[in-house]
């Protein structure tokens, strides 16, 4: 027998699925309520159903977690979140799953004894990000699904936080929380629980003028589902405490079937018996649901075509697993004496309750038989209880109306239910006041000219732009900074070193040494794209030299304040808020993107490797959709810089939008947002094109000229995300 604390965590998109999960052996269930969950199109729970589910879970010694794992707008957080959570908190909700750090800090302040689980949407990829969340009050982390067992084990050994990972179900092509594809394509934001799954659509792929020979239904980004039965012991031994099944959009039968199979094998492992997976169980899971087969996920491989379905063909069999309702055994003692009240005593799990009913009558004629009384008392219906034994003590010739027996039984069961859940309930709390803002600062008059910063991914583009007028500062990746940094340049322009979009593994020594040297010689700080990079820089004493990129979401003022208290220099305006929503946001420490190709996805998968083979070179592939729009896919083979890290170990793809984002015609509206600064981001542009675009925006924003008429998308600036 293995002495381990484990948890089998199942999904429920409806109350029926919740019952199916509990009945099949789940230790805990995660659900979405009427709002703020990352599966907005699941049936989800009403308030009454959710409170009942919390109570039912506690009766059976199970736990229930509520998803609040979306990004919230100011009015939602300020006006709705407290009242939304309060009844569930009072009912004894075990934890909330959270993505938004503004929501995180709000819950920590208003519900201090409510556990917070950091969602996989936070894109936690390493130990320092995990420690940062631990310091802020998280009790559990759901790291990025892309992490290997080796990475997870290292995190577990160095932090006391619980680790939860996915063991079965759908895989996103993008790092969770780093996907804007559905949002940009059709306004349905994955960060709001409304993903339309454009990664499951057909795309043709070209690279170096070569087209991959897939058919018209070839889905270049569609991953197989994950199934980890064969490596479950490895996952547990790496330090994963909670084994999470994906599938809140699935039917109760799926939840019951998958949960039951994993319960069987988790118990097998914990019992100390030889661990062996039966082929019939693998087939059973595929019959429940399959998307081109299954894979083991990223636990023991970094990427590869073996993980890809390359199709969106979903299959589910006609299997209907038994959905079992579990019952708690109760012990009862019924006392019936003439001219005395009916007395029913019930005991369950150390709790004893007593109910008294109407008066027992003396039977003048035919006395009531015990069998008839027992039949009536054993009618427990759809309750959470079943009789283990019921002693009936009859003193003399008695008669009791059936109505009286029913009433005393219902009263006793109601008392018992309340006794079992009462210890889990919490007292009411009052909403804590939000911090008063400096209204003069939030609504200061903005001058016509704001500082303009330029981000350059390509060294040749940076070379052309370095001597252009009107630029306050530059954001450079390592290779570009290494090539062009000088104390003289740092004296004339603010220089910031950009971190990789995804931070995994050890930060290369050369990167750290060079960054420290450049700081000593005048470099201002860092443009940070992820929590891990920030946490590492903060640990080194550089937290107050960090600028947050748009991928570090600050949708609401609570999140702005969270980072302001951290001391960061500024944040980047979120790309999914519209102009009207931005007017209700504190932008005084924010930088607005004026131009750039929006990253739609960051993926550990590689289009080039999967379809053409890996060359280890920075190259660009192109996806073409059914409307003939082409989306550049940049292969970031050396995220830290060339020759300073193990090549391709933690490389990634960035999929950009087909049309660049640009606001040359929105100068008057931009001026009303009370911003700190503006940014132009150059990624894949040729040097001369970048120079021409810079000139256009300089003409409009600094010289009061007219836009050139180039084609841009305004993204969400006008429409916003759902």
Please provide the spans of the model-predicted regions:
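Conserved phosphate-binding/catalytic loop of the ribokinase/pfkB sugar-kinase fold
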Residues: 122, 126
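Surface-exposed amphipathic alpha-helical tracts and adjacent flexible/coil segments at the periphery
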Residues: 1-24, 28-40, 47, 51-55, ...
């Amino acid at each position: 027998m293995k002495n381990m604390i484990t948890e089998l965590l199942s999904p429920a998109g409806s109350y029926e699925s919740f019952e199916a999960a509990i009945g099949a052996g789940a230790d805990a269930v995660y659900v979405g309520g009427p709002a703020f969950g990352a599966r907005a199109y699941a049936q989800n729970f009403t308030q009454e159903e959710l409170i009942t589910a919390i109570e039912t879970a506690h009766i059976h010694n199970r736990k229930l977690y509520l998803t609040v794992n979306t990004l919230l707008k100011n009015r939602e957080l300020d006006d709705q979140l407290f009242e939304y959570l309060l009844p569930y908190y009072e009912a004894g909700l075990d934890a909330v799953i959270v993505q938004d750090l503004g929501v995180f800090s709000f819950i920590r302040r208003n519900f201090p004894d409510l556990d917070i689980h950091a969602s996989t949407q936070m894109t936690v990829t390493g130990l320092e990000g995990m420690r940062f969340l631990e310091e802020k009050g998280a009790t559990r982390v759901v790291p990025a699904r892309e992490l290997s067992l080796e990475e997870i084990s290292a995190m577990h050994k160095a932090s006391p936080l619980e680790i939860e990972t996915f063991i079965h179900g759908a895989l996103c092509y993008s790092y969770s929380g780093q996907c804007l594809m559905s949002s940009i394509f059709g306004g349905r934001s994955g960060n709001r629980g409304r993903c339309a799954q454009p990664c499951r659509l057909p795309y043709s792929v070209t690279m170096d003028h070569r087209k991959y020979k897939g058919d018209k239904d070839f889905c270049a980004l569609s991953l197989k589902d994950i199934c980890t039965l064969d490596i479950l012991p490895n996952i547990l031994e790496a330090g994963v405490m909670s084994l999470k099944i994906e599938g809140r959009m699935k039917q109760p039968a799926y939840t019951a079937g998958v949960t039951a199979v994993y319960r069987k094998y988790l118990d097998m492992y914990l019992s100390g018996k030889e661990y062996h997976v039966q082929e019939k169980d693998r087939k059973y899971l595929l019959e429940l649901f399959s998307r081109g087969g299954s894979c083991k996920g990223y636990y023991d491989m970094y990427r590869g075509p073996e993980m890809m379905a390359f199709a969106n063909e979903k299959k589910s069999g006609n299997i209907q697993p038994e959905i079992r309702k579990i019952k708690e055994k109760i012990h009862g003692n019924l006392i019936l004496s003439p001219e005395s009240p009916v007395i029913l005593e019930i005991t369950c799990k150390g709790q004893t309750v007593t109910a008294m009913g109407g008066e027992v009558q003396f039977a003048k004629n035919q006395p009531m038989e015990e069998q008839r009384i027992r039949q009536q008392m054993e009618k427990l219906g759809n309750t959470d209880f079943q009789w283990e034994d019921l002693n009936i003590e009859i003193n003399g010739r008695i008669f009791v109306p059936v109505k009286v027996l029913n009433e005393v039984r219902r009263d006793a069961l109601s008392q018992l239910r309340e006794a079992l859940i009462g210890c889990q309930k919490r007292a009411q709390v009052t909403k804590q006041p939000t911090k008063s803002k400096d209204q003069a600062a939030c609504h200061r008059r903005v001058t016509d000219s704001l500082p303009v910063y330029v981000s350059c991914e390509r060294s040749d583009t940076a070379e052309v732009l370095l001597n252009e007028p009107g630029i306050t500062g530059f954001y450079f990746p390592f290779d570009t900074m290494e090539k062009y940094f000088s104390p003289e340049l740092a004296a004339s322009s603010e220089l910031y070193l950009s971190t990789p979009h995804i931070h995994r593994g050890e930060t290369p020594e050369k990167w750290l040494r060079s960054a420290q040297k450049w700081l000593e010689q005048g470099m201002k700080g860092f443009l940070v794209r992820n929590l891990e990079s920030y946490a590492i820089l903060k640990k080194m004493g550089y937290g107050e030299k960090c600028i947050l990129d748009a991928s570090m979401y600050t949708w609401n003022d609570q999140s702005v304040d969270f980072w302001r208290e951290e001391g960061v220099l500024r944040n980047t305006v979120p790309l999914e808020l519209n102009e009207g929503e931005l007017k209700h946001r504190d932008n005084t420490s924010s930088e607005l993107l004026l131009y750039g190709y929006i990253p739609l996805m960051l993926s550990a998968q590689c289009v080039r490797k999967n379809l053409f083979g890996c060359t280890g070179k920075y190259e660009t592939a192109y996806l073409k959709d059914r409307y003939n729009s082409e989306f550049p896919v940049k292969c970031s083979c050396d995220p830290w810089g060339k020759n300073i890290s193990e090549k391709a170990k933690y490389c990634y793809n960035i999929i950009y939008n087909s049309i660049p984002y640009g606001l040359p015609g929105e100068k008057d509206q931009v001026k009303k947002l009370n911003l700190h600064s503006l940014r132009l981001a150059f990624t894949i542009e040729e040097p001369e094109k970048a120079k021409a675009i810079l000139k256009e925006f300089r003409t409009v924003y600094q010289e009061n000229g007219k836009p050139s008429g180039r084609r841009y998308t305004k993204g969400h600036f006008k429409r916003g995300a759902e």
